[in-house]
Amino acid sequence: MSTLRLLISDSYDPWFNLAVEECIFRQMPATQRVLFLWRNADTVVIGRAQNPWKECNTRRMEEDNVRLARRSSGGGAVFHDLGNTCFTFMAGKPEYDKTISTSIVLNALNALDVSAEASGRNDLVVKTAEGDRKVSGSAYRETKDRGFHHGTLLLNADLSRLANYLNPDKKKLAAKGITSVRSRVTNLTELLPEITHEQVCEAITEAFFAHYGERVEAEIISPDKTPDLPNFAETFARQSSWEWNFGQAPAFSHLLDERFTWGGVELHFDVEKGHITRAQVFTDSLNPAPLEALAGRLQGCLYRADMLQQECEALLVDFPEQEKELRELSTWIAGAVR
């Protein structure tokens, strides 16, 4: 029986693909070597210890239907579209070795007539007239008996959108968490205009087989039928949840301020695990009572636009004469925390 396993996803859903990856990693025998090939439609993928409000333009992502996905490995934030090819190599210890998987990807690129080299801990770069340019970034995860290396290759990604979603709004955010390092990148189509996702997957697969001296049939993973993976439904539910993607952010503070015709408002939030642990409101409004009441209501509230809006609008029952001010406040807060 082969010790290799090759899986190819036909889904572009980042939560589905990351849930598949997690399930395979947890249940694979320690003697198995796995290659998983996949890609995501418009998604910002953040590292396990990152703060999405710090890393991403969450408001623009929501407007453009770009998903947020938190992965289980460390590292920085990346934007995925269908111009990216994603790969995951898994193996049990002591055989797990990220230099092996890196060399497999380099061999695959070489077979496609792309001369690339490893740079730093995580990147693959190519030489261009403008200097070295990154075409691949990676992240890693290890447990006591196994490890994985996953990464992306930029084929024909819309690089302008990287800046759209990975440059966060200039919010007054004092946040802990790992900040992403921005690198100069290029697409492989700059070197090979006709290159496709299918060609890259085939090249990586062949390099994988060549390294281990074995071949195996590909398993196609599809959301049309629930994958036969232990605990997949629960893993997918967690991977797609707000609590995981946003709520796992490290503790941070957020300061919001705005001047309305009826007065200035300053809000101070402390947020832990996606919940407001402390809310302070300062205002020069002639009637501060609704804002003082709001501070009390927001304690323990989920740090989510719809929940904050709900708490603002709940005050209309007690302060109906200030409906105009409260609706303005509600709309502003909801926009400011997206």
Curated annotation (Swiss-Prot):
<feature type="binding site">
    <location>
        <position position="71"/>
    </location>
    <ligand>
        <name>ATP</name>
    </ligand>
</feature>
<dbReference type="Pfam" id="PF21948">
    <property type="entry name" value="LplA-B_cat"/>
</dbReference>
<comment type="subunit">
    <text>Monomer.</text>
</comment>
<comment type="function">
    <text>Catalyzes both the ATP-dependent activation of exogenously supplied lipoate to lipoyl-AMP and the transfer of the activated lipoyl onto the lipoyl domains of lipoate-dependent enzymes.</text>
</comment>
<dbReference type="GO" id="GO:0036211">
    <property type="term" value="P:protein modification process"/>
</dbReference>
<dbReference type="GO" id="GO:0005829">
    <property type="term" value="C:cytosol"/>
</dbReference>
<feature type="binding site">
    <location>
        <begin position="76"/>
        <end position="79"/>
    </location>
    <ligand>
        <name>ATP</name>
    </ligand>
</feature>
<dbReference type="GO" id="GO:0016979">
    <property type="term" value="F:lipoate-protein ligase activity"/>
</dbReference>
<keyword id="KW-0963">Cytoplasm</keyword>
<comment type="pathway">
    <text>Protein modification; protein lipoylation via exogenous pathway; protein N(6)-(lipoyl)lysine from lipoate: step 1/2.</text>
</comment>
<feature type="binding site">
    <location>
        <position position="134"/>
    </location>
    <ligand>
        <name>(R)-lipoate</name>
    </ligand>
</feature>
<feature type="binding site">
    <location>
        <position position="134"/>
    </location>
    <ligand>
        <name>ATP</name>
    </ligand>
</feature>
<dbReference type="Pfam" id="PF10437">
    <property type="entry name" value="Lip_prot_lig_C"/>
</dbReference>
<keyword id="KW-0067">ATP-binding</keyword>
<dbReference type="GO" id="GO:0005524">
    <property type="term" value="F:ATP binding"/>
</dbReference>
<feature type="domain" description="BPL/LPL catalytic">
    <location>
        <begin position="29"/>
        <end position="216"/>
    </location>
</feature>
<comment type="pathway">
    <text>Protein modification; protein lipoylation via exogenous pathway; protein N(6)-(lipoyl)lysine from lipoate: step 2/2.</text>
</comment>
<dbReference type="InterPro" id="IPR023741">
    <property type="entry name" value="Lipoate_ligase_A"/>
</dbReference>
<dbReference type="InterPro" id="IPR045864">
    <property type="entry name" value="aa-tRNA-synth_II/BPL/LPL"/>
</dbReference>
<dbReference type="InterPro" id="IPR019491">
    <property type="entry name" value="Lipoate_protein_ligase_C"/>
</dbReference>
<dbReference type="InterPro" id="IPR004143">
    <property type="entry name" value="BPL_LPL_catalytic"/>
</dbReference>
<keyword id="KW-0547">Nucleotide-binding</keyword>
<protein>
    <recommendedName>
        <fullName>Lipoate-protein ligase A</fullName>
        <ecNumber>6.3.1.20</ecNumber>
    </recommendedName>
</protein>
<keyword id="KW-0436">Ligase</keyword>
<dbReference type="InterPro" id="IPR004562">
    <property type="entry name" value="LipoylTrfase_LipoateP_Ligase"/>
</dbReference>
<dbReference type="GO" id="GO:0017118">
    <property type="term" value="F:lipoyltransferase activity"/>
</dbReference>
<comment type="similarity">
    <text>Belongs to the LplA family.</text>
</comment>
